[in-house]
Amino acid sequence: MRKTFFLVAFVVLLVFISCDTPFFSHEGQKVTVMIVGLDYEPRQKDVFDKPIDLKWSSYSVGKLLGTINDSKEFGAALSSSYKEKNVDNQMIFMLSEGDSPDYSNPLYPTATNIISQISSLELDEDDLFVFYYAGHGFLEDDELYFITADKSLGSFCTELKASYLMDAIESVGCRSAVIIDACYSGAFDPKNSSTPNTLTNSLKSIFKENINTEYGYQMSVLAASKWNEKSLENYNVLFNDGNSEIHGHFTGRLLSALNWRHSLSKTTTVENSDGTMIVANGYSSGIVGSLSLDDIYSKLFDERDYPDLYQYPVLYYTNESINLIPAN
């Protein structure tokens, strides 16, 4: 009888460990969302003079028309969903918008300020940290970099190495969801450079190389494009009054997955961490049930337009994907 019992227990254990592990949820826990968006609006005559010691000096940096719309509305969509589901959350917007920002503001998105804001977070291991970036990205020696602002010159002449960003996010010490809308953003995974195009449909692409096992927390990374693709701004929203609004191809569809409704007449206001108010054009129509990054990736991949011409979204994660929105 004892042999039979242990045999049954062993079989049950095998069945259990062979099943997919449920997605982690953050119900009852705190969510901190950091939104970084840059429009690269020229601010002075020599704004694009490029110091020769910076890697991005050989790249063309043009103004982006959709990044601020993307940043404000994605943040508002998350904030609205968390509020609806009674999830404790904090919103941190780091935006470089227009031709006269406050360069002295600690939320101005220089590379130093971004890392400093992340490093100052005090979260528990069961909390969730969501990081979103909308801006220019470039590759140099197989490394991904983001072009950030410089407060001393009021220009764009600093760069943030993706691996440094990942180190900072890992050190927060909790589960994290990283969403990047930038050219070549799939380069977050060094293996991706050898991944055939036909494999990008896999929902189980494993993101391991950039994970420091010292921490061991769950991390999901959703990238707008593969390592060798640009991230386009061709998602145009037309309003009834004839006005229009530009979004990134990736974030436009990301907002759709979050049931965001674009509107000029009905806006959403979100309080930033410094007490200022961020106004987004539109509102959330609500999300029934939970929404994981796996769910979002599947929707983005299935709804991509002209897949041979536009970019492919890419998803990496350690062990399990993460619920961006909880069930209730």
Task: Annotate each PLM feature.
Residues 19-145, 235-238, 317-328:
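Boundary/activation segment at the start of structured domains
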Residues 176-308:
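Active-site-proximal C-terminal subdomain of hydrolase catalytic domains
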